[in-house]
């Protein structure tokens, strides 16, 4: 399973660890993904999504129905 948020599309990025001596080594910055279930009242069922914390905040702001409509328009759910 890919480490990608289903709502925002956030994925791992690549950067550097930087030591005190300014030595640089490659590292990955992973999104803060959570597996969450949301109850959709309009459909009277639960929907499971793998969302980042930013995706959870977006769902709180717009509502689960609007977010699911966007996902279905993109063909992801």
Curated annotation (Swiss-Prot):
Keywords for this entry?
Answer: Ribonucleoprotein, Ribosomal protein
The gene behind this protein is: rpmB
| One Gene Ontology MF term | structural constituent of ribosome
> What is the species listed in this Swiss-Prot or TrEMBL entry?
Cupriavidus metallidurans (strain ATCC 43123 / DSM 2839 / NBRC 102507 / CH34) (Ralstonia metallidurans)
Matching SUPFAM superfamilies? L28p-like
Task: Output the GO biological process annotations, alphabetical, semicolon-separated.
Answer: translation
The cellular component terms of Gene Ontology attached to this UniProt record, alphabetical and capped at eight, are: cytosolic large ribosomal subunit
NCBIfam families named among the record's database cross-references: L28 (TIGR00009)
> What protein name does the entry list?
Large ribosomal subunit protein bL28
Classify the source by domain of life. Bacteria
The family assignment reads: Belongs to the bacterial ribosomal protein bL28 family.
């Amino acid at each position: 399973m890919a480490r990608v948020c289903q709502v925002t599309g956030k994925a791992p990025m690549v950067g550097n660890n930087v030591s005190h001596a300014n030595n640089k080594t490659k590292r990955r910055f992973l999104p803060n993904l959570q597996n969450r279930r949301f109850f959709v009242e309009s459909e009277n069922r639960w929907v499971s999504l793998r969302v980042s914390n930013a995706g959870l905040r977006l769902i709180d702001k717009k509502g689960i129905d609007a977010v699911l409509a966007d996902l279905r328009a993109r063909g992801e759910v």
